[in-house]
């Protein structure tokens, strides 16, 4: 008897477990079909692909018991995939859903916006008079998905009686939560929506089970999209994590990727720059209002087996105290344990997801995969790369490709190389090194130490073809300089891909964030050193953005 959580082997379900524990509730995991009979309330969180979810539920003998549980009238709360499986089908694959809601799940229209829909957006209650199930109209909730149930009363009037809230992305309205009888589901992730999300979870869990049984049907009405959606710009705090010379894991920050102190003193000469402990800093940035956190492992732990990796312990500990999205980078590749056990990239990523990560960031391995794709004619990958295997299992929204380019200066009058169409031209009032010059952006691997015969445009487009759901754009020339984001680079990449893009490298002030959001259509911006050194506080940064009429989460 009691509350059960269903995990079919999805991405990060640990964060929901951490949320429930933090809120003071007890639960058990569903481990066998009989647990559905024991459960008096069921929560089904899920991140990943619809087809994979249905397949895994069937393989484990849980699909039919899940359907019977929902039909029994006992309280059910589905999150993301846990909501989508209630529908008839998904254009993501051929598998059929449970058919509880007579409507298909379809992909977003990518012609006027980036897909996946990724970030913090509002949720508008369709019938406020019937209660809001913990959803606050003034709050933002975290979404990350490429497929949605369109709000379509003309073609699916019966399905629309399930609508509890709608959300607008671009000019599309979709069901961001559903409710009827004892069933509740959210497309957004309350466990990743900060205090607003925790309040929603707590509200549902504290409601007496008898009160879950009578949620009314929603009125079917025409809803018109607003001129603009409420999706916010995201501020991401990044922490480069490595072992210092004493063996402790610390957050450091490089100057053009060099993380060792240059000041010559007895204590610091050549030492790894130490800016704090990763778990404590992550908690600090969460409390300060960071929209996402990124932990980049820049130390090799080749002598540790996968399950003993120090970064896994960092992720587990951080996920217990932060309830916003967490990206992990570094080491997401095929590897071999000290005892010779092979660990494919998919298994490595899965370990981080189960520890509490939401996305994985892939760097050098993405370059090698796109080189292979280019050699094969750009059609499609062979399915073996880390990008492809992880995206297939967990959805493309779980895969970030991190690009580390360098500028290559050329004489625009004489350059006739293959990247002429990608050249950026220096401005007369720009830095002296850029005047009368042009340059293209060359990709690197191994932390910027090795250049490859590939441009940033080739890598970004190739990564999207292979299945990346987000592109993180760094620039070695600007890293740690405080000169501001390279707006030309950000605009170049945004023009070439349809997935969300994160600007990185060079932030030195709040104005630099204002500039990148004003001058480019980028979805998010990332910084590290200025936050670590408290040169810019996240709260002050958001105030500056709001003062410039840039929509951000409070």
Regions found by a protein language model. Give the residues of each.
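C-terminal helical cap(s) of enzyme catalytic domains, especially alpha/beta-barrels
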Residues: 370-380, 387-390, 514-554
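Acyltransferase
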Residues: 182-225
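Pocket-forming structural segment of enzyme catalytic cores
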Residues: 88-168
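Catalytic cores of alpha/beta
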Residues: 322-359, 409, 488-525
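Glycine-rich beta-strand-to-loop/alpha-helix junction loops that act as flexible
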Residues: 45-51, 79-83, 296-298, 326-336, ...
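Conserved N-terminal beta1-alpha1 strand-loop-helix module at the mouth
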Residues: 218-322, 378-382, 389, 393-401, ...
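Cysteine-nucleophile active-site neighborhood
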Residues: 47-121
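Active-site beta->alpha loop and helix N-cap motifs at the rims of alpha/beta catalytic domains
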Residues: 286, 290-292, 296-366
């Amino acid at each position: 008897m009691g509350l059960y959580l269903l995990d079919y082997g999805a991405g990060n379900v640990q964060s929901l477990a951490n949320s429930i524990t933090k809120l003071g509730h007890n639960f058990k995991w569903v481990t066998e079909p009989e647990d559905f009979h024991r459960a008096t309330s069921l929560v089904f969180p899920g991140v990943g692909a619809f087809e994979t979810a249905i397949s895994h539920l069937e393989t484990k003998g849980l699909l039919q018991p899940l359907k019977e549980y929902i039909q029994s009238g006992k309280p059910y709360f589905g999150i993301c995939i846990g909501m989508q499986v209630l529908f008839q089908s998904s254009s993501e694959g051929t598998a059929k859903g449970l058919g509880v809601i007579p409507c298909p799940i379809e992909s977003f229209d990518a012609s006027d916006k980036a897909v996946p829909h990724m970030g913090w957006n509002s949720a508008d209650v369709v019938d406020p008079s019937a209660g809001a199930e913990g959803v606050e109209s003034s709050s933002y909730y975290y979404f990350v998905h490429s497929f949605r149930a369109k709000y379509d009363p003309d073609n699916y009037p019966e399905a629309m009686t399930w609508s509890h809230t709608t959300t607008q992305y671009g000019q599309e309205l979709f069901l961001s939560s559903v409710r009827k009888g004892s069933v509740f589901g959210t497309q957004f992730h309350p466990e990743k929506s900060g205090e607003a999300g925790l309040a929603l979870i707590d509200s549902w869990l504290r409601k007496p089970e008898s009160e879950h049984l009578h949620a009314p049907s929603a009125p079917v009405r025409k809803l018109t999209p607003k001129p603009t959606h409420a999706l916010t710009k995201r501020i991401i705090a990044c922490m480069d994590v490595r072992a210092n010379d004493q063996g402790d894991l610390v957050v450091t920050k490089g100057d053009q990727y060099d993380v060792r102190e240059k000041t010559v003193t007895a204590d610091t000469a050549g030492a790894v720059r130490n800016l704090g402990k990763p778990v404590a800093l992550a908690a600090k940035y969460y409390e300060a209002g960071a929209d996402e956190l990124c932990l980049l492992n820049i130390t090799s732990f080749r002598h540790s087996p996968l399950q003993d990796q120090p970064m896994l312990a960092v992720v587990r500990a951080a996920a217990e105290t932060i309830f916003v999205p967490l990206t992990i980078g570094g080491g997401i590749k095929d590897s071999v344990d000290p005892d010779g056990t092979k660990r494919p990239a998919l298994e490595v990523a899965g370990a981080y997801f189960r520890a509490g990560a939401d996305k994985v960031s892939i760097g050098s391995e993405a370059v090698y995969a796109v080189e292979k794709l280019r050699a094969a004619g750009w059609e499609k990958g062979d399915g073996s790369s880390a990008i492809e295997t992880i995206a297939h299992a967990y959805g493309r929204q779980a895969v970030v490709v991190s690009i580390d380019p360098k500028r290559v200066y050329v004489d625009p009058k004489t350059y006739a190389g293959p990247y002429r169409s990608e050249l950026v031209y220096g401005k007369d009032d720009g830095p002296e090194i850029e005047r009368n010059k042009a340059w293209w952006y060359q990709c690197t691997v191994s932390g910027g130490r090795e250049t490859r015969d590939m441009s940033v445009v080739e890598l970004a487009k190739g990564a999207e073809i292979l299945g990346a759901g987000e592109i993180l754009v760094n620039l070695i020339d600007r890293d740690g300089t405080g000169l501001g984001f390279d707006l030309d680079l950000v605009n170049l990449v945004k023009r070439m891909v349809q997935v969300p893009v994160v600007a990185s490298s060079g932030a030195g002030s709040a104005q630099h964030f204002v500039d990148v959001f004003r001058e480019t259509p980028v979805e998010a911006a990332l910084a590290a050193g200025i936050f670590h050194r408290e040169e810019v506080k996240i709260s002050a940064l958001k105030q500056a953005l709001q003062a410039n009429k840039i929509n951000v989460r409070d």
